[in-house]
């Protein structure tokens, strides 16, 4: 199978040449594009999630031999969660080569965390199936390397951390309100306000509601923690 120039360039970016290029094509094919004769990337995404998890668990153990399980778990979760996979996918331009159906094309599928994260995991599995575990491990460590060393000991996602902060003080969970939406349908920008019962609030913008909520939660958490220092 001959790959397009765009997908060949993507291979260069991730540093892997496929002996079985059909694996990569499948990894890049979303369910909205699949047909009866051509499968999508869901099965590869399932496998890639497990390969990523094993590599991250081992990398964290090696990076901090003295860390306890309770310290490792939040770091691990921060490294393998869908938002992180989507961030890595954006860094390597994976969205540019995703094979999407018309419905996803019209609704900005190339920018969605869910599609990018799933695609990243599917690409990991494609490398694993093409060249084995060591090749997949090398890819993951190359793409995630800076994150492994920088991940915080308290690496809960901001929404979880903010909710736990509120609960510890007898407050109800924070509310997230979409205050504005701008941009075209294929590239929307969401403005989300995170608010506590105390009246404290913070606002953030992002290309998806999930990203905007996380960013608003992070800003509000920093605000309330600073005020209570």
Swiss-Prot record:
Keyword list, A-Z: Cytoplasm, Endonuclease, Hydrolase, Magnesium, Metal-binding, mRNA processing, Nuclease, RNA-binding, rRNA processing, rRNA-binding, tRNA processing
EC code(s) of this entry: 3.1.26.3
Catalytic activity field: Endonucleolytic cleavage to 5'-phosphomonoester
SUPFAM superfamilies: dsRNA-binding domain-like, RNase III domain-like
Domain DRBM: from-to ranges: 157-226
Gene Ontology CC, one term: cytoplasm
Binding site for Mg(2+): 45, 118, 121
Record carries keyword tRNA processing: yes
Subcellular localization: Cytoplasm
Gene3D superfamilies: 3.30.160.20, Ribonuclease III domain (1.10.1520.10)
Every RNase III domain range: 7-132
GO MF entry, a single one: metal ion binding
One Pfam assignment: dsrm
Main location: cytoplasm
Single Gene Ontology BP annotation: mRNA processing
Cofactor entry: Mg(2+)
Annotated catalytic residues: 49, 121
Main function: Digests double-stranded RNA. Involved in the processing of primary rRNA transcript to yield the immediate precursors to the large and small rRNAs (23S and 16S). Processes some mRNAs, and tRNAs when they are encoded in the rRNA operon. Processes pre-crRNA and tracrRNA of type II CRISPR loci if present in the organism.
Family of the protein in this entry: Belongs to the ribonuclease III family.
Quaternary structure and interacting proteins, as annotated: Homodimer.
PANTHER family: RIBONUCLEASE 3, RIBONUCLEASE III
Protein name stated in the entry: Ribonuclease 3
Source organism of the structure: Dinoroseobacter shibae (strain DSM 16493 / NCIMB 14021 / DFL 12)
Lineage: Bacteria, Pseudomonadati, Pseudomonadota, Alphaproteobacteria, Rhodobacterales
Gene field: rnc
């Amino acid at each position: 199978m001959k790959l397009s120039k765009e997908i060949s360039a993507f291979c260069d970016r991730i540093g892997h040449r496929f002996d079985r290029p059909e694996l990569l094509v499948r990894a890049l094919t979303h369910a909205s594009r699949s047909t009866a004769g051509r499968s999508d990337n869901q099965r590869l995404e399932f496998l890639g999630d497990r390969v990523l998890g094993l590599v991250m668990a081992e990398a964290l153990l090696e990076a901090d031999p003295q860390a306890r399980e309770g310290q490792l778990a939040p770091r691990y979760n921060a490294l393998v969660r869908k938002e992180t996979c989507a961030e890595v996918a954006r860094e390597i331009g994976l969205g540019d080569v995703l094979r999407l159906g018309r419905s996803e094309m019209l609704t900005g599928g190339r920018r969605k965390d869910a599609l990018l994260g799933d695609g990243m995991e599917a690409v990991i599995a494609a490398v694993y199936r093409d060249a084995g575990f060591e090749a997949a491990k090398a890819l993951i460590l190359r793409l995630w390397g800076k994150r492994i060393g920088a991940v915080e000991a308290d690496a809960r996602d901001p929404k979880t951390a903010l909710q736990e902060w509120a609960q510890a003080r007898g407050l109800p969970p924070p509310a997230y309100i979409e205050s504005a939406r701008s941009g075209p349908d294929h590239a929307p920008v969401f403005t989300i306000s995170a608010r506590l019962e105390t009246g404290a609030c913070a606002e953030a913008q992002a290309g998806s509601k999930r990203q905007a909520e996380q960013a608003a939660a992070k800003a509000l958490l920093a605000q309330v923690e600073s005020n209570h220092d």
